[in-house]
């Protein structure tokens, strides 16, 4: 798991996932 290597807030994958979650919630 690379989550421990890169801060979640700095992870592009996390940002993309978070954005998708926000968009889904907004819908």
From Swiss-Prot:
Is Transcription regulation included in the keywords of this UniProt record?
no
- Residues of the region (Disordered) are 1-27
GO cellular component annotations of the record: photosystem I
> Which GO BP terms apply?
photosynthesis
Q: Which UniProt keywords apply?
A: Photosynthesis, Photosystem I
Query: Organism's domain of life?
Result: Bacteria
* Family (UniProt): Belongs to the PsaF family.
Known function? Probably participates in efficiency of electron transfer from plastocyanin to P700 (or cytochrome c553 in algae and cyanobacteria). This plastocyanin-docking protein contributes to the specific association of plastocyanin to PSI.
Please give the name of this protein. Answer: Photosystem I reaction center subunit III
Annotated organism of origin: Thermostichus vulcanus (Synechococcus vulcanus)
